[in-house]
Amino acid sequence: MKRLLSFCFALVCSSLLLFAQTLPTGGATETTPSKSEYFSWINNTNEGPTAEQTLTNLRFFQWLHDRYGMVLDLYAFDAGAIDGAKIYGSMRSERFKKQFPEGFGPLSEQAALSGTRLGIWCGPDGFGSTDSEAQEREDMMASLVEKYHFGLFKMDAVCGQLRPEQYNRFDRMMKRIRQTDPGFVLLNHRLDLGPGTAHSTTFLLGGEETYIDVHMTNDFTATHHRAKALSRTSPKDLTRLTEDHGVCLSSCLDYWEDDLVLQAFGRELILAPEIYANPWLLRDDEFPTLAFLFNLHRDYRDILVKGLRLPAEKYGHEALSRGNATTRFITLRNLTWNPVTYEIQLDSETGLDKKSKRVKVRQYHPYILDLGYHPYGSKVQVTVEPFRATLVKITTEAERDGIALSGIPYQIINDRTGGTTEVKLLGMPGCTYQMTLERCTQRFSSATIDGKTESALLKGQKVSVTFPGQKPQKDFHRHLTTLQPCQVPNDAESIYYATCFAADNNALEARSLKRSGETRIPEVKAARDAFFNQSLFQGRELWDRYLFDSNPTTAFSISFRFGDSRTNSSSGFFLDLGALTELDEVIMESFDEYSITPLKSEEGQNAYLSADLQHWTPVTFRSGTRMHIPTKAAGAFRYLRLPDCPFRLTEVSGVRNGQSVDRSKWHASNLFRTYGQGGCQATQAWKGQFHLDEALEGSYLCIAVNGEHGAEGAWAGLKVEGKYIGCPDRAPSYKCNPWEFQSGNSEKNYTFYIPITADLIGKDLEAWTLTFNDQQVKPEVWITAYPIPFQQKELHLQRK
């Protein structure tokens, strides 16, 4: 394996040296094709990665390569592999040897199996105070490229600035590295490198990190958390020699693919597509989309380097066209609550030269759809759904896609590996589509739809495809009602608590795992387990699961790493049993006296129990490190709350007839305020009524609270036939006990989300908004769906 790796790398280096004279000192020009990258920040934080976890992650990317043909050019270690925050390291240190017992060799070899090179986060200095120390640093950094074939350094001011007296040493080191690899990528994050700045390939665009609802949060209402990310713009001159920090796949994952389309095909910087953190947290059915976008970009990356900004008055915010005179990719977006239809001009306005009488138009996102041939100079209409992006190709060339269909929306699952091209056919319930197979680059010997042979498709004939279900009578995305001011209701407390019990304060990554569900893919499961089983993830005590794991060494705690994250330093403890339950007692355990703060041992406390969020039964117990809360007299209950939450709890359990009960449906939160405490008292209310007679799969309600309301100053919920339904999600996200950094917030324009379940259909619903101050807002309710509520069939085409 090592001999093969060295041979392959020698071939790469030889080809690079042939055009070394054409590359500038920074290793790339504005027309250098992009490189795809993953970097590991948030998969680990400043403690750094380990060899074991990295191998697991690399095997995940190898699975994407082997299953879908996806190629990742660069896998970059983030902080802590060698250097760390405010400190330089060495590959000879005990710390490094503990993290990487066999060094970088096995990792470089694993990466090479799927065509990937490693990269690393580091500082620009570390040259010490003597010539020998400086030489040791230079040799170590150069060896990463010369011996282990690294392709990227991400140099960050978090480690430290380059001392002026080391400018020449840095310049010498980088010249040595570029002798080995002229196209080596050097990312400059907020550094003054003096004369060595010329070695920088990129600079950080706007200084923005893209961890959703941590460093990038919505400040306007929207159907999802990533709307602010979708509003990002490219540099004014469309320079590509900058870096936008990529697309974070760790938190608030819905609509991630729109974010990636705009990053890869819109901004299309020198690193694109660029992702980071925890892509294994996507759902199993989303990995084909991830691979498809990487593959599509790779197919066309040579021409995507030339960009054209389209007139905003015609094409909307930050519409871009990329490509050459015969093929263009156009990115459109819609940052409003209603669908927007744009007219794409098929001529020089969008970058096409007149070399053909007709232009082929195909949409690639949010699904693939043939939009037909049109005369050069004509217009074609494309509708962009609310708070979404759309990717369209216009071309006068012959089709380059391996598989191309017309007459039906579809997504490509796999057209690269194995002998079968797999396509997901999409259609609305109860609708019929006339599908044809277009001339494309692949040739096929057989075709089946859901296992049924469809030979007519291979003969160029139309095939009728009908999807099950009842045809929708209304748009899946629509406005339902505008809430009107009213008196604060007597049950405002119940409306408030419904959302406290529906939501959680877990780390954002734990929320993403819940969103995506179990995986059937071993490589995905291994990467998830490697992340969540890290000792630091457990040690930071940021997941309510640790209350119910029968492990006295784990805990769920109020995080104070970044100060007091509670609103007005106040929060209660909320426990949802998941169903009405009869218990003799609830037992809460903690480590020590400090951990039960603000409670004090042997003092009497009240807990409150409820079956319906409206009627609460107080019970008295004695506080301590093991608290027995008597619940038998209250009868069946589902909800338990403490007005004041202990800082740290290790276990919460229930006992019935002397036996511990199952806790698999239990969950808890610890950052929400008790109603009536810490400024949490409704002073204004808005109410809206509507009848929900139709909702497609994946539908959810958006209660958009438009206007200024202050941080944590607005709340929302539903009432249905006297029952209270909370909002389990909100943008910006509810407060969390964070893994990497504290969650962001906004003082305006919250959007609360409620998934639509079958028991809501055909019912009269009341939507409520409460505010805790005197500011005026304008709440309204929308219904939408994610993903688009298509039914699906699978088309399999056996390749010749």
What are these regions (language model features)?
Residues 174, 180-369, 379-391:
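Active-site-proximal substrate-binding groove within the catalytic cores of carbohydrate-active enzymes
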Residues 20-119, 125, 277-312, 322-327, ...:
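Conserved structural scaffold segments of CAZyme catalytic domains across common CAZy folds
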Residues 71-257, 648-653:
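Aromatic- and carboxylate-enriched substrate-binding clefts and catalytic-loop regions
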Residues 292-296, 307, 451, 465-469, ...:
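Disordered, acidic Ser/Thr/Pro-rich linker "stalks" and the adjacent N-terminal cap
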Residues 7-18:
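Bacterial N-terminal signal peptides
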Residues 335-354, 424-444:
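Surface-exposed beta-strand/loop patches in extracellular or lumenal glycoproteins
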Residues 306-327, 398-431, 669-690:
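Surface beta-strand/loop "capping" patches
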Residues 369-422, 428-433, 455-499:
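C-terminal beta-strand-rich structural cap/linker in extracellular carbohydrate-active enzymes
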